[in-house]
Amino acid sequence: MLTLTRIRTVSYEVRSTFLFISVLEFAVGFLTNAFVFLVNFWDVVKRQPLSNSDCVLLCLSISRLFLHGLLFLSAIQLTHFQKLSEPLNHSYQAIIMLWMIANQANLWLAACLSLLYCSKLIRFSHTFLICLASWVSRKISQMLLGIILCSCICTVLCVWCFFSRPHFTVTTVLFMNNNTRLNWQIKDLNLFYSFLFCYLWSVPPFLLFLVSSGMLTVSLGRHMRTMKVYIRDSRDPSLEAHIKALKSLVSFFCFFVISSCAAFISVPLLILWRDKIGVMVCVGIMAACPSGHAAVLISGNAKLRRAVTTILLWAQSSLKVRADHKADSRTPC
């Protein structure tokens, strides 16, 4: 257990503002990712074949719906149940662990999407790379099942690491600038060890994502040089596909790094320094990142854009019909 001589309190106004922002982020994130899920799932209901990228987007939207739900539960825990003067309760620790696992599955899916973009857009000249790209295109469903299996294995290992590690106490003495002496008694760092384990387990998919994204960037550079020499038309479908894919991957990289840094900072803020305001800021950042990438995916996917246009036209026609009906009812006979 951690005992500090000074504990920062959080006012009711701050907690209410944070909860309002959390509800808003949950609503936006749920709507955007539910939209991606429903558009692709509707094709499954109609028994239309899904492309490989649509299958990945379907799984990605499910994982992000789970992420948003966990972050919203974390916000409720912070504002109503988790006290600064007490150690982390088991429910909040469980939420953090589940978020780490869901975030790791999200990273594996993004790496899978990056590999898929490489196999579809890059023109390989080496025989091995051509066979590898063809294998990725054929085995995308098996890769998705493998991601689910890896997530389950990670869940079991994290639970085992969390509950099997023995309890211990570490006392640390810190001298502040005003010569204030703080005795830190840190007990049961199992959550932090599980957190580090999940981050280490995320290194392989992150490296895979970086390598495939780098290959796509190099391919885009080569394609643009080829266009300058041989092609005069600025509208090239291959170039547009490269740019859209890179926008999606670069935006995911930025959002993932920001979200991971916020998550990593939030753990010592709450365990060591009991800075609930800092944790609230980190949770808000973590909740905003999946919504931002979902918006980028919708803007870069033709099928999703058509669905958005259809919904907007339907809403506009419905409002027009309702307005005409009200105008007719007010007109005297």
From Swiss-Prot:
<feature type="transmembrane region" description="Helical; Name=5">
    <location>
        <begin position="191"/>
        <end position="211"/>
    </location>
</feature>
<feature type="transmembrane region" description="Helical; Name=7">
    <location>
        <begin position="277"/>
        <end position="297"/>
    </location>
</feature>
<keyword id="KW-1133">Transmembrane helix</keyword>
<keyword id="KW-0919">Taste</keyword>
<feature type="transmembrane region" description="Helical; Name=1">
    <location>
        <begin position="18"/>
        <end position="38"/>
    </location>
</feature>
<feature type="transmembrane region" description="Helical; Name=4">
    <location>
        <begin position="143"/>
        <end position="163"/>
    </location>
</feature>
<comment type="function">
    <text>Receptor that may play a role in the perception of bitterness and is gustducin-linked. May play a role in sensing the chemical composition of the gastrointestinal content. The activity of this receptor may stimulate alpha gustducin, mediate PLC-beta-2 activation and lead to the gating of TRPM5.</text>
</comment>
<dbReference type="GO" id="GO:0016020">
    <property type="term" value="C:membrane"/>
</dbReference>
<feature type="topological domain" description="Extracellular">
    <location>
        <begin position="164"/>
        <end position="190"/>
    </location>
</feature>
<keyword id="KW-0807">Transducer</keyword>
<comment type="similarity">
    <text>Belongs to the G-protein coupled receptor T2R family.</text>
</comment>
<protein>
    <recommendedName>
        <fullName>Taste receptor type 2 member 38</fullName>
    </recommendedName>
</protein>
<dbReference type="Pfam" id="PF05296">
    <property type="entry name" value="TAS2R"/>
</dbReference>
<dbReference type="GO" id="GO:0033038">
    <property type="term" value="F:bitter taste receptor activity"/>
</dbReference>
<keyword id="KW-0716">Sensory transduction</keyword>
<feature type="topological domain" description="Cytoplasmic">
    <location>
        <begin position="298"/>
        <end position="333"/>
    </location>
</feature>
<feature type="topological domain" description="Cytoplasmic">
    <location>
        <begin position="39"/>
        <end position="55"/>
    </location>
</feature>
<feature type="transmembrane region" description="Helical; Name=3">
    <location>
        <begin position="95"/>
        <end position="115"/>
    </location>
</feature>
<feature type="transmembrane region" description="Helical; Name=6">
    <location>
        <begin position="252"/>
        <end position="272"/>
    </location>
</feature>
<keyword id="KW-0675">Receptor</keyword>
<feature type="topological domain" description="Extracellular">
    <location>
        <begin position="1"/>
        <end position="17"/>
    </location>
</feature>
<feature type="topological domain" description="Extracellular">
    <location>
        <begin position="273"/>
        <end position="276"/>
    </location>
</feature>
<dbReference type="GO" id="GO:0004930">
    <property type="term" value="F:G protein-coupled receptor activity"/>
</dbReference>
<feature type="topological domain" description="Cytoplasmic">
    <location>
        <begin position="116"/>
        <end position="142"/>
    </location>
</feature>
<feature type="glycosylation site" description="N-linked (GlcNAc...) asparagine">
    <location>
        <position position="178"/>
    </location>
</feature>
<keyword id="KW-0812">Transmembrane</keyword>
<dbReference type="GO" id="GO:0001580">
    <property type="term" value="P:detection of chemical stimulus involved in sensory perception of bitter taste"/>
</dbReference>
<feature type="topological domain" description="Extracellular">
    <location>
        <begin position="77"/>
        <end position="94"/>
    </location>
</feature>
<feature type="topological domain" description="Cytoplasmic">
    <location>
        <begin position="212"/>
        <end position="251"/>
    </location>
</feature>
<keyword id="KW-0325">Glycoprotein</keyword>
<keyword id="KW-0472">Membrane</keyword>
<feature type="transmembrane region" description="Helical; Name=2">
    <location>
        <begin position="56"/>
        <end position="76"/>
    </location>
</feature>
<dbReference type="GO" id="GO:0005886">
    <property type="term" value="C:plasma membrane"/>
</dbReference>
<dbReference type="InterPro" id="IPR007960">
    <property type="entry name" value="TAS2R"/>
</dbReference>
<keyword id="KW-0297">G-protein coupled receptor</keyword>
<dbReference type="InterPro" id="IPR030050">
    <property type="entry name" value="TAS2R38"/>
</dbReference>
